[in-house]
């Protein structure tokens, strides 16, 4: 059973300024499934479509972003939810925080700088649960905080009184207060030092293990995916380049772009110079024809310049979009 099924999703930014129309193809024909009780990683360079993808699947679709094609369907137990056609009232009342929660890139995007942490918990809990007993609310909140290994005194602190790592942990605690089926974590370790990063990642892993929910982890840091993800999707220029179990992505990558990502990772004891990838990511308002990676690919063929490669299943749970794979020349 799938928790989330995304099929042929095309989400573009359509703008018009000074009489000039512009369409940015941020997500262009993306299809994938999420399953219960897994950590699914999404990786890729900046502006590859990662953030747009999670905006759509979380129901945060606002102009100039438009969904032109595709479907985003959830299964929460016996309940089916079509995310592209649900009303905003139903989304706010029944889905957000309770079934789908969002850990934003910056913890200060969630925490109000002039309100204590306990007030932010109160806003979320009171909105989604009919709690009239303040004592019961405090007990529930302290119990949740303690379960995640956080000291209860953070509840009476203002955000500026907490370290960056502690604020991020509080943001994760807020996102998991209702034990949602899906937690979307957007660059949860950005701007944190390595030691704090490890603590935040361990917290995410512990929450997933305790609640058996699904985590969609979005980050460009491949080391983070190696540490926590069960499966990884590699995006490039709005499309899926490769999707596979984490072990396969790191030990046997098939797409040339994935191969370069893995080869660029530092290895202890290796003093060799890492080769850089020539060129720059394409402009998604005017993407190249055919395979979008072909201007930078060392194995480019004529067909790559004209024909979009299909995302094909090459072995169990391993999909690749590359003409080289189809011709068995890698």
Predicted regions and their residues:
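ABC transporter nucleotide-binding domains
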Residues: 1-251, 320, 326-330
């Amino acid at each position: 059973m799938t928790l989330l099924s995304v099929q042929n999703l095309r989400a573009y930014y359509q703008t018009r300024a000074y009489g000039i129309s512009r369409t940015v193809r941020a997500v262009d024909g993306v299809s994938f499934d999420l399953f219960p009780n897994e950590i699914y990683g999404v990786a890729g360079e900046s502006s590859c479509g990662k953030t747009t993808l999670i905006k759509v699947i979380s129901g945060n679709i606002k102009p100039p972003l438009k969904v032109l094609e595709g479907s985003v369907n959830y299964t929460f137990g016996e309940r089916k939810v079509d995310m592209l056609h649900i009303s905003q009232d139903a989304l706010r009342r029944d889905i957000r925080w309770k079934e789908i929660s969002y850990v934003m890139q910056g913890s200060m995007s969630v925490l109000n700088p002039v309100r204590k942490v306990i007030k932010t918990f109160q806003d979320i809990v009171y909105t989604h649960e009919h709690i009239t007993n303040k004592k019961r609310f405090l007990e529930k909140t302290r119990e949740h905080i303690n379960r995640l290994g956080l000291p209860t005194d953070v509840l009476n602190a203002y955000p500026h009184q907490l370290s960056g790592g502690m604020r991020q942990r509080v943001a994760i605690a807020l996102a998991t207060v209702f034990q949602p089926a899906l937690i979307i974590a957007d660059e949860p370790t950005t701007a944190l030092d390595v030691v704090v990063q490890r603590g935040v990642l361990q917290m995410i892993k512990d929450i997933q293990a305790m609640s058996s929910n699904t985590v969609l982890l979005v980050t460009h840091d491949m080391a983070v995916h190696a540490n926590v993800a069960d499966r990884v999707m590699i995006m490039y220029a709005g499309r899926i380049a490769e999707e596979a179990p984490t072990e396969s992505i790191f030990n046997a990558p098939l797409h040339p772009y994935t191969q370069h990502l893995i080869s660029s990772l530092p290895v202890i004891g290796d003093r060799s110079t890492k080769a850089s990838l020539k060129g720059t990511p394409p402009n998604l308002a005017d993407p190249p024809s055919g395979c979008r990676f072909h201007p930078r690919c060392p194995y480019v063929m004529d067909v790559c310049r004209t024909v979009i490669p299909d995302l094909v299943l090459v072995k169990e749970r391993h999909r690749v979009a590359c003409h080289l794979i189809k011709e068995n020349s890698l």
